[in-house]
Regions:
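N-terminal Sec-pathway targeting helices
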Residues: 2-17
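C-terminal region of N-terminal signal peptides and the immediate post-cleavage residues
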Residues: 24-47
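N-terminal non-catalytic regions of secreted/periplasmic and cell-surface proteins
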Residues: 39-83, 115, 124, 134-143
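Aromatic sugar-binding surface patches on proteins
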Residues: 101-108
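Surface-exposed, short loops/turns at beta-strand junctions within beta-sandwich domains
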Residues: 110-118
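Active-site-adjacent structural segments surrounding the nucleophilic cysteine of cysteine proteases
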Residues: 139-200, 315, 322, 326, ...
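Conserved active-site-adjacent core of cysteine acyl-enzyme catalytic domains
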Residues: 186-347, 351-357
Length: 381
């Protein structure tokens, strides 16, 4: 069939009209009709999953970290779920928690991690828009703490040896906070008001209290044990658990060296069968003092610079020498004039005898709700 030129033009116009009609109909159909006066179509933006800002805080982190993992996290966005995985695998459960407000929480492990090991805690937090990973790296402490600065108890070389515990408080304060606000004498003067006994120096309550007064992040409490072996095992346990030095009350209640290391192995919990302690590493505020003017105090006991950086003491000496743990805490001590002075706790807070015939240590147990004048209450065995 043939068409004239006029017919072809008419057919082309019809096709063009149909095409325009189809385009308009398509637009109306898929835009839901014409918008009202003054309205504009709402653009559709792609969903953006942005990770929240998260801060992770871990005490003693990150080069000689406590072997008990306990860290806190805080998020800028509400968290619906949290979990953590630790590598290398410690062989026991690690978990994460969320506080009621959904903006912070903790993550921890059930046992002690291996010493001198690089770990990565992989924290996963879930918000309404997605799940996001956060990596926390740290290295656990080895058998001993390093960079524990030593201080003497003989700030006055001609003074009486009453500042041993105060000097050890200064050592602990400096290591745990990096600050050195008070001399041993100033710590002794400050701490005596907190004594709960007639101790001429600082008793266990005063030691714990003055450490917390100097820095609120320190939560030291005293613990009592029936045997020197149990006290030593607990001291090493708390050393590696807290990553902080331990003070041991020695010399029959009259001295307070700082335990900052051990020789041997310590497993994943207090009564771990693999635990083998063959020696302890201590700093001593008196026996590290090499000033000739102070040598008249206990000249029968050797002095060495090792007590300024950490002296290894074998268990035979540690258990058998009266300077260390040969004798338990007594009810009274002999004074320079030959008289005896009672040093038992006497404020009525506990039945007596309380310290007598016990081996006493002071540790940071992290128990912020327990006042420092109370005995430690954390169950660890």
């Amino acid at each position: 069939m043939r068409y004239t030129s006029a017919e072809r033009v008419a057919q082309g116009g019809l096709v063009a009209f149909a095409l325009v009609f189809a385009v308009v109909a398509f637009a109306v159909l898929f835009r839901g009709g014409e918008a009202g006066p003054g309205a504009s179509p709402t653009p559709t933006a792609p969903t953006i999953s942005r990770a929240p800002d998260v801060t992770i805080t871990q005490a003693t982190c990150c080069k000689q970290t406590a072997r008990l993992l306990l860290a806190t996290w805080e998020s800028s966005a509400h968290i619906n779920a949290a979990k953590v995985a630790v590598t290398p695998d410690p062989g026991f459960e690690c978990s994460a928690s969320i506080d009621a407000n959904g903006l912070k929480g903790t993550f921890s492990c059930r046992g002690l991690l291996k010493g001198a090991t690089d770990y990565v805690a992989n924290l996963q937090l879930t918000t309404p828009v997605g799940t996001f990973p956060f990596e926390h790296r740290f290295k656990t402490m080895g058998e001993r703490l390093t960079d524990v600065k030593w201080f003497t108890e003989f700030e006055d070389p001609t003074g009486e040896p009453l500042s041993c515990a105060a000097a050890s408080c200064r050592i602990i304060q400096n290591y745990t906070t990096g600050k050195d606000p008070l001399t041993a004498q100033a710590i002794l003067d400050l701490g005596r008001q907190f004594n709960r006994s007639n101790d001429p120096g600082l008793d266990p309550v005063a030691i714990a209290t003055v450490l917390q007064r100097m820095d609120a992040s320190n939560h030291y409490h005293y613990y009592r044990f029936d045997t020197r072996e149990d006290a030593t095992g607990a001291a090493v346990y708390w050393l590696v658990r807290s990553g902080k030095p331990v003070m041991v009350i020695s010399l029959a209640g009259q001295h307070g060296p700082v335990l900052m290391g051990f020789q041997g192995t310590f497993g994943t919990y207090y009564d771990d069968p693999s635990n083998r302690i063959t020696g302890v590493v201590v700093e001593d505020p008196q026996r590290g003092d090499l000033n000739p003017q102070t040598q008249n105090h206990r000249p029968d006991k050797y002095r060495t610079a090792g007590f300024q950086t950490g002296q290894l003491i074998g268990l035979d000496e540690w258990y058998g020498d009266e300077w260390w743990l040969r004798f338990a805490y007594p009810a009274s001590i002999k004074m320079p004039d030959g008289s005896f002075q009672n040093i038992e706790r006497n404020d009525g807070a506990y039945p007596t005898p309380h310290w007598e015939k016990k081996f006493v240590i002071l540790v940071d147990d992290g128990d912020a709700d327990n006042p420092p004048d109370r005995e430690g209450r954390v169950k660890f065995r």
